[in-house]
Each structure stands twice: as structure tokens, then as C-alpha cells.
């Protein structure tokens, strides 16, 4: 696992974990250069990225290289003005979107129950959509959907969604299909939260 990060923030990632691999990047072109290394078999964009043009361009660059992708947080919100641009870029790929209700509503205008909305969203964008909450719904473009039932209240702690996104990516790059990786990631995340509690 390598964390691509602006140079001015590298020390934040390596201070307590000197063995953590980091690569500096300033622009989306720098990020695209990192993606030329085929050993980078999966890409997570979103947590802490910022809602800006660089995040927008990084998402599109990641989608273009055809690797496994998880998009969370800012990587979703940055497309709120033009969600179709995101959907065109990712449709049919091994990609998982992990929005909470607020992020979901910025991309999709569906009404109805959570299960129906998640299914419609997955069908529309052509990838797995994981709509987070106490009853997280994981939906596939083919209509299959699952509802997680083991979520403890400790998952409302900041950062648990980032951990979830990373867990899903780890499963994806090991060859697990997107729907199964999302389901397993949600279950593992909830189980860990129940075991370790808040913090």
C-alpha cells in the first residue's frame, strides 16, 4: 500500500509510521504518472482529498487506467454539479462507490426507500453502490442487493468510512469481485467496530 500525498503533508503520514510508503504528488498529472506503475493495482480516492479540480481530475485519471477503484467522500462530492461525467467514466468497471446519505443525495435524485434508491443508483452508474448507514445497503448494477445488519453505533465515529473504503480496496486488489468485496468490507468494518468500541 502506497499513500499518494502532497509533499507538504508527507510528514503527517510517516511521523508515526516510518515504514509507510508514500509518493508525493502536486497535480493530477503527477498522480497520472504514479498510475503508470502497474504494481498500483487498486486506487482509493476521496478521504481528505478536498473538493477541488485536482480531486476531480484524479478520479477521472484513476478511472481511465482500468484498475480497481473505491471512491468515497470528496471524490464523490466533487461531481455534484455533473454526476453524469463520473458515471460515464466508471460504468462497467471494478469500482465501488461508498457514499453516506448526504453524498448520495448530491449525485442521485432518487426518492423512495433506501434499498430501491441504492439499486437504481447502481443500475444508473454501472458499478456497485454502497449506501452507508445503520442499515448499509450494497447494490450491484445487475439488481442484486444486500443489507448489512451488524452495524454498531460505534460506526458513527469519524474516520470509520475511510477505514471501510480501505478495507474494500484491499479485498478488491486480492481479486474479490466488487459486490463481494463491498459486502465483506462492510461486515468486517462493523465487526471491528463492535470489538474495539469508540475511538
Model-derived segments and spans:
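Small-residue (G/A/S/T)-rich helix-start motifs and N-terminal tracts that mark the onset
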Residues: 1-70, 77-96, 101-199
Amino acid at each position: 500500500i502506497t499513500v499518494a500525498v502532497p509533499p507538504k503533508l508527507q510528514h503527517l503520514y510517516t511521523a508515526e509510521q516510518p515504514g509507510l510508503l508514500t509518493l508525493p504528488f502536486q497535480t493530477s498529472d503527477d498522480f497520472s504518472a504514479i498510475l503508470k506503475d502497474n504494481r498500483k493495482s487498486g486506487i482509493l480516492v476521496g478521504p481528505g482529498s478536498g473538493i477541488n479540480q485536482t480531486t476531480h481530475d484524479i478520479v477521472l485519471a484513476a478511472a481511465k487506467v482500468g484498475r480497481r477503484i473505491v471512491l468515497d467522500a470528496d471524490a464523490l462530492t466533487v461531481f455534484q454539479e455533473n454526476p453524469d461525467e463520473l458515471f460515464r467514466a466508471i460504468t462497467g468497471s471494478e469500482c465501488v462507490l461508498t457514499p453516506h446519505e448526504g453524498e448520495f443525495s448530491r449525485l442521485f435524485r432518487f426518492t423512495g426507500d433506501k434499498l430501491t434508491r441504492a439499486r437504481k443508483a447502481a443500475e444508473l452508474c454501472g458499478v456497485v453502490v454502497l449506501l452507508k448507514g445503520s442499515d448499509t445497503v450494497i447494490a450491484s448494477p445487475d439488481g442484486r442487493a444486500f443489507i448489512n445488519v451488524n452495524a454498531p453505533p460505534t460506526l458513527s465515529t469519524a474516520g470509520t468510512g475511510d477505514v471501510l473504503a480501505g478495507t474494500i480496496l484491499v479485498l478488491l486488489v486480492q481479486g474479490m469481485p466488487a459486490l463481494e468485496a463491498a459486502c465483506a468490507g462492510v461486515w468486517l468494518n462493523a465487526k471491528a467496530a463492535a470489538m474495539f468500541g469508540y475511538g
